[in-house]
């Protein structure tokens, strides 16, 4: 003998469990199915347990896997081939079969692909149609819940995207930018849209400043009118520019008037119109006379109510709030002190006569300028005004 085993005519079993392959020679061909299972448990010790469910399949001449259920199937397999190729399946898992693992992995990848497609479709904007995908019928409840959650998150993301896009829109955001700029400088809409306030009082008596301010204060479409006594205002603004502030301090309102220059046109316009529309005739002579005698006890408003006695006849529209700028009132504030009223012993003289026009003592006129009294004429603002020297009444509460 040559020392080699004579395997001719004997049964050889090749068992495979996963990647582990064993070759076993069988001397007793009358082996049963239970003995074969016990043999496999001893061969693959540690991999097969007594309580594991083991399925044994053999490969025929065509390469197909045939299941062995009992001893008759095992004897028939032994007759077909002397080399019995067995494949073990433990607990139904296709670990030994590579093709079964590929199928299992392929099915898992298909499910993952469907989930990814559903998430991508939920993130698409609602206006654009997303790509249509065929969802298999064996979807679980968890997949549907994930789909609804992803749809809600997609809608929220589109809303946030739309809000961020509108924040950078220059046309829609222009009003907010203007409001932020005005609030940063401490301005309001009325101050920005309204006309600019009157500047300083040093140019209040000059004709060019009066013309420019009156044209700026008039609304479009209304003819601006020059106030009377241009020459007198020019002289008063040039000579008594310094005495104006002293007179304001003596009268008791000089500390309040310079603090609020934007409100001058509105305050004087209301007081001026109220003095001609609400007060009666006997009040104006009293105000004019009291202003010449006691300049420190009167408010600045009687100067405007008493002034029209010396003015020529002009339409009443020039004394409205929108047609009379603030510079005209500042220049006329010191004018009533330049003239003295006729004494009360002359009740027969009408208020429109120029006999009471006298310059104030100490008033020096400029060279080249003549002081001419205003032309006489009916006063359009007098409403049955009695002559001087009679009893007077105090102004109403709406005057101040």
Swiss-Prot record:
Site positions per UniProt: Breakpoint for translocation to form TRK-T3: 193-194
Omega-N-methylarginine modification, residue list: 385, 400
Region Disordered: start-end pairs: 120-160, 187-400
Tissue: Ubiquitous.
Signal peptide: none
Modified residues (N-acetylmethionine): 1
CDD domains: PB1_TFG (cd06401)
GO CC list: cytoplasm; cytosol; endoplasmic reticulum exit site; intracellular membrane-bounded organelle
Phenotype upon changing residue 285 to L: In HMSNO; does not affect interaction with PDCD6
Highest taxon, organism lineage: Eukaryota
Coiled-coil intervals: 97-124
Main localization of the protein described in the UniProt heading: endoplasmic reticulum
InterPro entries: PB1-like, PB1_dom, PB1_TFG, TFG
Keyword set, alphabetical order: Acetylation, Chromosomal rearrangement, Coiled coil, Disease variant, Endoplasmic reticulum, ER-Golgi transport, Hereditary spastic paraplegia, Methylation, Neurodegeneration, Neuropathy, Phosphoprotein, Proto-oncogene, Transport
Residues carrying Phosphoserine: 50, 197
Pfam family, one: PB1
Gene Ontology terms for molecular function: identical protein binding
Positions with biased composition (Low complexity): 237-258, 265-298, 307-327
Biological role stated in the UniProt entry: Plays a role in the normal dynamic function of the endoplasmic reticulum (ER) and its associated microtubules. Required for secretory cargo traffic from the endoplasmic reticulum to the Golgi apparatus.
Disease implicated: A chromosomal aberration involving TFG is found in papillary thyroid carcinomas (PTCs). Translocation t(1;3)(q21;q11) with NTRK1. The TFG sequence is fused to the 3'-end of NTRK1 generating the TRKT3 (TRK-T3) fusion transcript.
Protein name: Protein TFG
Organism: Homo sapiens
Gene name of the record: TFG
